[in-house]
C-alpha cells in the first residue's frame, strides 16, 4: 500500500488510489479486528498507522483487540493503538495480549514453545471473549435503524 497521499480522509472524500479502495472494501467486510504489532521506538510501525489511516468509516462502530510483542510486551504501542482506535470510532477491548521481549525471543529462537508461556492463555481467552461480546453487540447496533439523540 502506498503512503497516504489522498486529499483527505475517506470520511470526507472518496479515496482516489485503487489500492486504498480495495483495502477499504476488505476492511468493511469484517465485524471486528485483532491487530498484532511489534513496538519500535515506543510506538507502532509506520506501515500499520498508514493502513489505519487509509480507511475511516470502515472501522467505525467495530471492536478491536491487540496482541503485541516487544521489550515491555508492546504496552506503549498498544496504548497508542487504543487511542487511534477510539479516534476511528472503534471499541477497543480492555484486555490485550502482551508478549514480553525475553519470552518472544525464546520462542523465536526455538528455546521455548509458545504454549509454555502460561500467562498468555488467560489473557488471550479474556481478550477473545471481550472481542466476541463487543462484535455481537455492535453488529446488532449497526443493523438497527439510527435513532437521533434529539428523539
Task: Map each language-model feature to its residues.
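N-terminal beta1-alpha1-beta2 submodule of the flavodoxin-like/Rossmannoid cofactor-binding fold
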Residues: 1-37, 42-50, 54, 112-125, ...
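A generic "cationic amphipathic patch" detector
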Residues: 46-47, 64, 77, 94, ...
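Short, surface-exposed basic-aromatic patches at helix termini and helix-loop junctions that form
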Residues: 57
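Short, glycine-/small-residue-rich phosphate/pyrophosphate-handling segment
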Residues: 60-108, 116-123
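Rossmann-like dinucleotide/phosphate-binding beta-alpha-beta segment
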Residues: 87-91, 132-137
